Amino acid sequence: MTELTRIPLAGVIGSPIAHSRSPALHGYWLKRYGLKGHYIPMDVAQADLRDVLAAMPRMGFVGCNVTIPHKESVIGLADIVTDRAALIGAANTLIFGKDGKIHADNTDGTGFTANLRQNAPAWQPQSGPAVVWGAGGAARAVIAALIEVGVPEIRLANRSRARADALRSDFGAKVHVHDWVQAGNILEDAMTVVNTTSLGMVGKPEFRVPLDALNPKAVVTDLVYAPLRTRLLVEAEAAGCRTVDGLGMLLHQAAPGFERWFGVRPEVDEETRAAVLAT
């Protein structure tokens, strides 16, 4: 075996993939820590997913990140699925074992809580209800994480009521579903507020939920990070809230996979953030 074939490969699979910041992030960490390795973005069509996953270990890949639209599909293709990935119903991190088995995990929830703990140090999730807007895959990861850290109640609103009801049936009595027209009315006394929808993202409709009932003691975070300062965060900051943008979640969710693939737990700090924003 040559030296070249021993260099670990990782990557991110999705479609489209050109927008992903993951290659810049992992490339920065590899350079920062002086590690041998490569991180490669791959545009993979749904029809090719099974064949690509089967081929990657033979090509020297030790694992990969997974993004839209494959996060749910890879659950059924993995040999071993962590409990949290099974609960969420999606995986964003794959590890290719030396035994040939594919291990699937979901680090979105831990990335979410790590981002809040780093950038809102006074955040106390047990101190009051949480409001979550959206009921997609990101919302599932966030709700699982909020339950794990002890949030007493989760008020969920989504533009499709049926999706929110399905999510409640999976996560249990702590989740209370509200119609989307009530999205602003469920803010009273909430201590954590999370937008998991694409509203406010570049190229998407603007976020227009009224925030009059927002608790100024709440921590407000938006998973959207393009733009970094969304309308929600600007208005919440004006109301006196501590606000946290969505870029930190992307950075923190990436760290566990990088450690598994390349053997070093990377720091998520201002230098990391600046390197990703510069791309």
Swiss-Prot record:
Its EC number is 1.1.1.25. GO terms for cellular component: cytosol. GO terms for molecular function: NADP binding; shikimate 3-dehydrogenase (NADP+) activity. Gene3D superfamilies: Leucine Dehydrogenase, chain A, domain 1, NAD(P)-binding Rossmann-like Domain. NADP(+) binds at D83, G134, A135, G136, G137, A138, L223, G246. InterPro entries: Aminoacid_DH-like_N_sf (IPR046346), NAD(P)-bd_dom_sf (IPR036291), SDH_C (IPR041121), Shikimate_DH (IPR011342), Shikimate_DH-bd_N (IPR013708), Shikimate_DH_fam (IPR022893), Shikm_DH/Glu-tRNA_Rdtase (IPR006151). Shikimate binds at S20, R21, S22, T67, N92, D108, Y225. It is an enzyme of class 1 (oxidoreductase). It catalyses: shikimate + NADP(+) = 3-dehydroshikimate + NADPH + H(+). Keywords: Amino-acid biosynthesis, Aromatic amino acid biosynthesis, NADP, Oxidoreductase. Pathway: Metabolic intermediate biosynthesis; chorismate biosynthesis; chorismate from D-erythrose 4-phosphate and phosphoenolpyruvate: step 4/7. GO terms for biological process: amino acid biosynthetic process; aromatic amino acid family biosynthetic process; chorismate biosynthetic process; shikimate metabolic process. The keyword Oxidoreductase applies. Pfam families: SDH_C (PF18317), Shikimate_DH (PF01488), Shikimate_dh_N (PF08501). SUPFAM superfamilies: Aminoacid dehydrogenase-like, N-terminal domain, NAD(P)-binding Rossmann-fold domains. It comes from the Bacteria. CDD domains: NAD_bind_Shikimate_DH (cd01065). The active site is at K71 (proton acceptor). Homodimer. Involved in the biosynthesis of the chorismate, which leads to the biosynthesis of aromatic amino acids. Catalyzes the reversible NADPH linked reduction of 3-dehydroshikimate (DHSA) to yield shikimate (SA). Belongs to the shikimate dehydrogenase family. This is Shikimate dehydrogenase (NADP(+)). It comes from Cereibacter sphaeroides (strain ATCC 17023 / DSM 158 / JCM 6121 / CCUG 31486 / LMG 2827 / NBRC 12203 / NCIMB 8253 / ATH 2.4.1.). The lineage of its organism: Bacteria, Pseudomonadati, Pseudomonadota, Alphaproteobacteria, Rhodobacterales.
